[in-house]
């Protein structure tokens, strides 16, 4: 979500250098409207839970002190991110949150549980040494990710035989953009998702193995062979194909078919994207010099994270710091707006959170409750369109909340096993935008993330309000240049490369 377009108070956090004071980025008193319904997370002793621990300043000294506070409080340090002053911890002590604040009273700003159930991915052994890795490039109940619809398999034969079925590429003028460029090998897109099939003929030549990683081991980056492969979901492979399926005589062609892809696995085998996984993903993308990330998910277990709830506010703080640090390091991020058919400017109910619990807690929410990462300032928030250009019935919407729109209904792309399938969701819209950003970065490598976002919005095709699909959901409001369905308009790949 572009900061300039947001009409309400949100997280505001810029992390550009070590030693920066990080106070007051999320205020529990700033939410507007009725207080949100508390969702207590009070595990008994002996239940291993995961936590974010945020320091007041982002520097190695405070991070070391926070780590000591964690261990003194009976916790285990899973992963530290001194660049942003965030420590990921696990503990089986019921009083861990209160105790770590006492032990780190001059350092710890906030502490929050990252999930409502016991940790499956318990971590043993020391974390890797601090500091960025070097890029390899020179210069259960399988919860549907983001609520997307199931995949419909599609057969493929012959040379790029399915390209003629890619109406989505025509809508965003990617086919015309390819006459200018297919993208640069110097551009790397991080696919924060469920993993990418490295054997798919349309993807294997574009996957950067050296920069791929698994973040689902408690939020600790793991480059073990095969760790970033898909296991229980085809979601990430489908998203990857939309971004950068190669022009190679097989199947389809992506928006940016010559850029590289890194699989950054943030979805576990049960289909959950916990906050520590996403923080790991954004930090990894920045450390490895990625140019673009795609984020076709919302962070579990809450569809909306409320700043008047201490646990949720601490998590939002950690995620915002990671997103902003990645942006400061040159990464621009696109995210799915969500599939609940909601107007994000007026939503007051959340019926399905926490979604990792046996029984969710229906709750009142307010405008201090946000879908993350889509509603983190600086992230490009993408709505979904049908083949005829209408807003998809499932797509979230909202004036000042949607930045751009892109095709997301019945999108043809790659799935594991060398196959192809149709999927629907804002998850399918976001990678079109990530691909356009990759083309734009290829054609204009000098542009910063903020400049890329500005050009993306300026280049979008203004689109007047339409009737809601099937007459469902809130009606469109605004002008052709900025409205609640299309944001600044339909993303335009051709203008991106000009």
Regions found by a protein language model. Give the residues of each.
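Extracellular S/T/G-rich loop segment that most often corresponds to the catalytic His/Ser-adjacent loop
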Residues: 331, 356-442, 446, 454, ...
């Amino acid at each position: 979500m572009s900061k300039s377009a947001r009409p309400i108070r949100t997280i505001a956090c810029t992390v550009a250098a070590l030693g920066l004071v990080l106070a007051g980025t999320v205020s529990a008193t700033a939410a507007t409207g009725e207080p949100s319904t508390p969702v207590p997370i009070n595990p008994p002793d002996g239940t291993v839970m995961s936590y974010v621990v945020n320091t007041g300043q982002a520097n190695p000294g405070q991070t070391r002190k926070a780590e000591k506070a964690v261990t003194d409080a009976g916790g285990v340090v899973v992963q530290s991110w001194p660049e942003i002053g965030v420590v990921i911890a696990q503990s089986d002590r019921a009083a861990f949150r209160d105790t770590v604040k006492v032990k780190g009273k001059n350092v710890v700003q906030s502490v929050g549980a990252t999930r409502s159930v016991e940790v499956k991915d318990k971590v043993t052994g020391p974390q890797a040494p601090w500091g960025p890795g070097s890029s390899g490039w020179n210069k259960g109940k399988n919860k549907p990710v983001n609520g997307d619809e199931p995949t419909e398999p599609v057969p493929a034969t012959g040379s790029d035989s399915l390209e003629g079925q890619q109406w989505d590429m025509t809508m965003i003028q990617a086919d015309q953009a390819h006459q200018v460029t297919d993208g640069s090998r110097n551009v790397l897109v991080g696919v924060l998702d469920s993993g990418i099939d490295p054997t798919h003929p349309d993807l294997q030549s574009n996957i950067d193995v050296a920069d791929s990683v698994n973040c689902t081991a408690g939020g600790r980056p793991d480059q073990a062979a095969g760790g970033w492969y898909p296991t229980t979901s085809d979601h990430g492979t489908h998203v990857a194909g939309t971004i950068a399926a190669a022009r190679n005589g097989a199947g389809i062609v992506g928006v940016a078919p010559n850029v590289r892809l890194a699989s950054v696995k943030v979805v576990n085998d049960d289909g959950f994207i916990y906050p520590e996984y996403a923080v790991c993903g954004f930090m990894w993308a920045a450390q490895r010099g990625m140019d673009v990330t795609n984020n076709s998910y919302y962070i579990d277990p809450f569809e909306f994270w409320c700043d008047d709830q201490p646990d949720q506010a601490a998590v939002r703080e950690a995620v915002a710091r990671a997103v902003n640090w990645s942006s400061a390091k040159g990464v621009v991020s696109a995210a799915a707006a969500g599939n609940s058919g909601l107007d994000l400017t007026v939503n007051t109910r959340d019926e399905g959170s926490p979604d990792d619990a046996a029984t969710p807690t229906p709750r009142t929410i307010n405008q201090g409750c946000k879908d993350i990462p889509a509603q983190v300032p600086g992230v490009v928030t993408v709505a979904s369109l049908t083949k005829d250009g209408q807003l998809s019935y499932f797509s979230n919407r909202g004036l000042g909340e949607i930045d751009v729109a892109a095709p997301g209904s019945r999108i043809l792309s790659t799935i594991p096993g060398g196959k192809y399938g149709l999927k629907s969701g804002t998850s399918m819209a976001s990678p079109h935008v990530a691909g356009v950003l990759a083309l734009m970065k290829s054609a204009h490598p000098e542009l910063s993330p903020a400049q890329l976002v500005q050009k993306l919005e300026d280049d979008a095709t203004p689109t007047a309000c339409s009737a809601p699909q099937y007459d469902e959901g809130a009606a469109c409001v605004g002008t052709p240049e900025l409205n609640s369905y299309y944001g600044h308009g339909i993303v335009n790949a051709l203008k991106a490369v000009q």
